[in-house]
UniProtKB/Swiss-Prot annotation:
Topology term for the membrane: Lipid-anchor
Keywords per UniProt: Cell membrane, Coiled coil, Lipoprotein, Membrane, Nodulation, Palmitate
Disulphide linkage map: none
Localisation: Cell membrane; Membrane, Caveola
SUPFAM superfamilies on file: Band 7/SPFH domain (SSF117892)
Protein name per UniProt: Flotillin-like protein 2
Induction: Up-regulated during nodulation.
Cited Pfam families: Band_7
Protein purpose: May act as a scaffolding protein within caveolar membranes, functionally participating in formation of caveolae or caveolae-like vesicles. Required for early symbiotic events and nodules formation.
Coiled-coil ranges (or none): 237-257
Family: Belongs to the band 7/mec-2 family. Flotillin subfamily.
Natural source organism: Medicago truncatula (Barrel medic)
Amino acid sequence: MKIYRVAKASEYLVITGIFIKDIKLKKKAWIFPGQSCTVLDLSPVNYTFEVQAMSAEKLPFVLPAVFTIGPRVDDQESLLKYAKLISPHDRHSNHVNELVQGIIEGETRVLAASMTMEEVFRGTKQFKQEVFDKVQLELNQFGLLIYNANVKQLVDVPGHEYFSYLGQKTQMEAKNQARVDVSEAKMKGEIGSKLREGQTLQNAAKIDAETKVIAMQRAGEGEKEGIKVRTEVKVFENQREAEVAQANSELAKKKAAWTKAAQVAEVEAKKAVALREAELQGEVERMNALTTTEKLKADLLSKASVQYETKVQEANWELYKKQKETEAILYEKKAEAEAQKASADATFYASKQAAEAELYAKKKEAEGIVTLGQAQGAYVSTLLNALGNDYTAVRDYLMINGDMFQEIAKINAEAIRGLEPKISIWTNGGDNSGGITDGAMGMKEVAGVYKMLPPLFKTVHEQTGMLPPAWMGALSEKSS
């Protein structure tokens, strides 16, 4: 039965099982049969350690530290690593605690061994940052992130009071420095008091002198300002008088222009009246001439129009006739072209159908040959399996089943039909039953071979008509 699970704000659901290739992280999901669901808490955890390390001078010390470590929630790959490697264990278990402690102690000891005690003590911030960086690099393999790291004050190891002695040294140096500072402060106070008195008298005299100078400067500046004001007033009066004169001059110019414009307008009005009278008189005369012209044009154009219309009608008829003839020829050519096209299409279609039919027949014939070959192959394979893979037996069976021996006999019979062979049998006529020695027996065999030659030559001559060479002998006339 499937179950619907929902994780809290600081949790994830780790789902494994069927339909899931590796693992799946979800905030909410259906859990089907065959799947396993584990809740993954993302809250960071505080780990408190007291790391015992040794500096480059072989001085041991204790470094108390508190690390706040948790899974990296902003990286999906880191969450998958954490879910695979850390989630099976409780976050507060010894396994996780020892893992984190081992990484922190190892990196802290390695780093402390490369620094002197003075460098560790005075560069606590830098030392803390380097430890932070190196530990974070190792925790990345497990998908963990250091959210905060607090390194407390370095502590002495019992029996090695380095920091205690260093503190006493610092206290004595501070005490001596304080005494020196008090003496220097008293000396500076007395010197400063005398210096302030002298500076007060000097400043008073300086201020008196500067006051007199400033008073004289102020008096001169007042006189200069008075002269400047009077000059500016005179300049302003002159400017106003010039502006008044300029305004009077412009007014006189405008009056003259206005008078001239009035006179010109009066003359233009008179001329305009005369021009208008002349225009009207010309218009009357033009209208009279136009009337006369239109009358003559009407008389002359009436005849020309009739002739023009007649010619136009004749030309249009000729044009229409030629267009129709051209259209008829074009239609005939078009019909002929369409007929040729239809004939070509029919021929092409017939050729195409014949080619397709031939292709189909060839294809079916090839398929039949392939099918027959496959059947014969299966038949031969079955025979071979039935006869125990004996190729000789299969060959003999196929030759018998295919009447091969009958065909061979028939062919041989046809080949010797009509022949009359003569069969001769001969022997040397001797044996070794008479007690002949081995040497005599060998000569007897040679003699037997010579006795066999005449009957052999005779048989060859009878069957083939060929005679032996002269050096081997000749047949008797009786035999020939």
